[in-house]
């Protein structure tokens, strides 16, 4: 693998980290540079450009996709691009496995405790075992075999589809599609149907679709199953531009999770802002997480019980009890309410639970994390 200390990555969605790159036009995702002596740098890899997205109501854009037959169309899937980048280091061609945002895909996480690099490697191992069920090679050895099978004159791109943990809307459970390669020297893109991914590891490629008219595109997008696909990806052949036409229902359901990597945090957010329709649609989209949602409700109840017990000890029994500052602010708020009318405003467990419901969801999320930590440390026995 490449020694990463001499490399850095700039993504079009991020700020430029270096003054010498202030004038760089960031049209592509995850541009990888190598630092050279005297504060110089060299671009190592620039793969896919930023992808513009629009729906079927944008008739003008859809009609433009049909002009002069400049585009190739593919079924679009939700997922993350994994890149195998090759570069010369100390006279030897070495590689790195990266995402668009991270030089090391094994350090890239979203919505899961398993990194994108691990997910990618594990799926390759599963693919290998399907064709070689009697193999005794280890996971790491198979991954090394896969990397060694790649042409070092190319950079490779793969789409690792979402799974039930990191999906926004749709999931194909870590299925890998070969998304094409780039020439190391010229950066010319080779579509997946025109180049081999690996002789030893044959990957599927995204389904290519032929459209004759813009209405064909609209008809197709309207019938897309949002649980499987986003819509279509259009790649312009000459200028190498990417566009996605997204199914309306898929687009609407992206709002349910939003860009929130934590399902627990998003659950609390939707619950506490009081949008019942969105909240129940979120639970329906992630209905296989019902045990998690039930646990969240149980944790809120236990949290209320803990806060009430601390309140009783501190303010009724006048016993010193140390609590984390985030708990202190809630206790102080409850006691302020009590002092407004001491005879009427009695701090019961039900009141504490209601006060939690009125608290900002970010604060409740912090309280739950701190409460769980205290439980794990054996400092709370409930």
Regions found by a protein language model. Give the residues of each.
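Core nucleotide-handling region used for phosphoryl-transfer chemistry
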Residues: 1-382
